[in-house]
Amino acid sequence: MTDSTRSLRNCLAPAKLNLFLHITGRRPNGYHDLQSVFQLLNWGDTLHFTLRDDGRVARVTDVPGVPEESDLVVRAANLLKTHTGTAHGVDIEIDKILPMGAGLGGGSSDAATTLLALNRLWQLDLPRAELQSLAVKLGADVPFFIFGKNAFAEGIGEELAEVQLPTRWFLVVTPRVHVPTAEIFSDELLTRDTKPVTIADFLAQQTSDAGWPDSFGRNDMQEVVTRKYAEVAQVVKWLYDVTPARMTGSGASVFAAFHSKHEAEAAKAKLPASWNGAVAESLNEHPLFTFAS
């Protein structure tokens, strides 16, 4: 990342994986209670921010299918501007590589990177807790990226506790299908009563010989998604013939973990040509973690 008084360039908005995802209940307002472990990846969209003196917030990159006014990045910048009353504006460029509807947190991570970067560029110096409170207004996953550490998540995803995870390499395969999260949450066959676990349960398993992402819990959404979307089911089956695999979030991406980059790249090389695969290393901390205190 490059840093100056008038711009911040090459700011990574890291993807996330759900190492497991349990749905433990449903609230009267329709929201679901979840338990999950969020894993940051050293892979994602890249954002560039340039200070404007006229107070305008402008996205200067076209993002197909996402109007500027509804883009979470623009909404995040305007939210921060309104909250603080700053006179500054910003031009935002986005190098978009994460697919939408993939369960990788792309839009949420972009929004969080925007809040963190503008906290620095606009010299606001807001504390992390205040940024997290703003982030909730943008989506349930955004506070995690502001939190900035791998985390055990509960509630609707906003109750976060840091977890230490070993370094791993992941192969992430994304079928050419968009899975609407709301559709999966509303499916009548979705499991909503998984017995709650504790962070101690997860950590004990991680330190055992079997401590691998596929060996704790499950993704409660995976059965519904693979029933509805044959492409996702095909990826899960193909990867399972190579190594244990699991869907992240509400899909459509599926991941497998490896001890080394070489192993992950070797598996990627065997993918069918029509599939989109990426190899990424785990992260322990958001690249912009120090932009909030």
Swiss-Prot record:
Pfam families: GHMP_kinases_C (PF08544), GHMP_kinases_N (PF00288). It comes from the Bacteria. It is an enzyme of class 2 (transferase). It catalyses: 4-CDP-2-C-methyl-D-erythritol + ATP = 4-CDP-2-C-methyl-D-erythritol 2-phosphate + ADP + H(+). ATP binds at residues 99-109. Keywords: ATP-binding, Isoprene biosynthesis, Kinase, Nucleotide-binding, Transferase. One of its GO terms (biological process) is isopentenyl diphosphate biosynthetic process, methylerythritol 4-phosphate pathway. The active site is at residues 16, 141. GO terms for molecular function: 4-(cytidine 5'-diphospho)-2-C-methyl-D-erythritol kinase activity; ATP binding. Its EC number is 2.7.1.148. InterPro entries: GHMP_kinase_C_dom (IPR013750), GHMP_kinase_C_sf (IPR036554), GHMP_kinase_N_dom (IPR006204), IspE (IPR004424), Ribosomal_Su5_D2-typ_SF (IPR020568), Ribsml_uS5_D2-typ_fold_subgr (IPR014721). Pathway: Isoprenoid biosynthesis; isopentenyl diphosphate biosynthesis via DXP pathway; isopentenyl diphosphate from 1-deoxy-D-xylulose 5-phosphate: step 3/6. SUPFAM superfamilies: GHMP Kinase, C-terminal domain (SSF55060), Ribosomal protein S5 domain 2-like (SSF54211). Catalyzes the phosphorylation of the position 2 hydroxy group of 4-diphosphocytidyl-2C-methyl-D-erythritol. Belongs to the GHMP kinase family. IspE subfamily. This is 4-diphosphocytidyl-2-C-methyl-D-erythritol kinase. The lineage of its organism: Bacteria, Pseudomonadati, Pseudomonadota, Betaproteobacteria, Burkholderiales.
